[in-house]
A protein has these predicted regions:
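Second-shell loop/turn segments in exported
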Residues: 40-48, 63-72, 99-102, 144-156, ...
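Active-site-adjacent substrate-binding region
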Residues: 96, 106, 224, 231-340
Length: 340
């Protein structure tokens, strides 16, 4: 009886040991899979984003003046953006067309597509708009409503971050996937607040609408997209925009985790934001590429939930913060270099 009990105990010990080993292998397998899928959780990766460089790129765009549609400043800045991307080894495709504004105005438009390793797959899409709003229609002074916006934040900042990422990609030349940077035109020619009619609802993001319906390459696809809108403002914090969560919630999770890993969780808050009509909508609904919008939310700002300078004459370099540029740029780099 004693031997039988001892044998039974020994068998039980072996059974439990084998079960433990099996569970350990399963756990390791799951951990390995989780690490692969959510590798942004592990540690900072990729080159250091240079906020001073991004700030300079922002300034250089503003030096042309407001880049409003059909203006000389717009045309000159277009050439500068193309040349800057080319100088960093990007293959550039200018997608030119004539769009129609809400008021019937023909708008000479150029979407600028700059590709890192254009023949490589998979691809990631990073985008921003580069035009300036023609009217400061949210300015507290009504006398400024028909003046153009310099668009240091609402335009130049997103392009500046993309240019600095492109420069960093060329410098390290180790990213094992392709990246397409798209500068969308005619985003900010939307229906002004001082108009008395009814906004038809599709007057914004005209360049993105055109690109989504007329892809720069037949059959173009990307694993996902990230839109950078107003990513240089003072006091900016980025909430999780609701339509981004609807169309690409897994990408929202990925980007916000990446921000936490690189130390910018105080900029990327785990809070729900409102839904925004922006360039990411046609990318999602027409091009069928899951795309999120990194856009600030100021819940306590009386002037606008987009911040105090939005669509005002004060959207200038005096209100650009290198810390915000750094937080966004380093987060996007973390996302890119975490991909497998």
């Amino acid at each position: 009886m004693e031997m039988t009990q001892r044998n039974s105990i020994s068998k039980c010990i072996w059974v439990y040991y084998l079960l433990f080993i099996g569970l350990l292998f399963v756990s390791c397998g799951n951990l390995r899979k989780q690490t692969s899928d959510n590798s942004v959780l592990m540690q900072p990766v990729g080159p250091v984003f240079n906020a001073d460089s991004a700030y300079l790129f922002c300034q250089q765009q503003c030096d042309f003046g407001p880049r409003t549609m059909n203006s000389q400043a717009h045309d000159a800045c277009e050439q500068w953006i193309v040349q800057k991307f080319q100088s960093y080894g990007m293959t550039v495709i200018p997608q030119k067309t004539v769009l129609t504004g809400y008021d019937g105005m023909p708008l000479r438009s150029t979407n600028i597509i700059a590709s890192y390793k254009p023949d490589l797959t998979p691809r990631i899409l990073i985008c921003a708009h580069w035009d300036s709003r023609p009217w400061a229609d949210n300015d507290p002074d009504e006398a400024n409503w028909h003046k153009p916006v310099m668009a240091a934040n609402d335009g130049a900042s997103g392009v500046a971050v993309m240019l600095e990422i492109a420069r960093a990609l060329q410098a390290v030349d180790s990213l094992a996937l392709g990246v397409d940077f798209i500068c969308f035109d005619a985003e900010d020619y939307g229906y002004p607040q001082w108009e008395t009619g009814i906004d038809p609802g599709n007057t914004w993001a005209l360049g993105a609408q055109y690109w989504a319906a007329n892809l720069h390459k037949p059959g173009y696809n990307a694993r996902y997209g990230i839109l950078l809108d107003m990513v240089g403002g003072q006091g900016a914090q980025f909430y999780q925009e609701s339509q981004s969560k609807q169309y690409a919630g897994h990408i929202v999770d990925k980007v916000w985790r990446a921000a936490s890993v690189v130390g910018y969780g105080s900029f990327f808050l785990m809070k729900d934001g409102v839904g925004i009509t922006d360039d990411h909508i046609p990318v999602n609904t027409v091009a069928k590429i899951p795309c999120i919008d990194i856009i600030p939310h100021y819940p306590f700002c009386e002037q606008s939930s987009f911040g105090p300078t939005w669509h005002t004459v004060n959207d200038d370099m005096a209100h650009i913060d290198k810390n915000t540029l750094q937080a966004v740029g380093q987060t996007v780099i973390q996302v890119l270099f975490s991909e497998r």
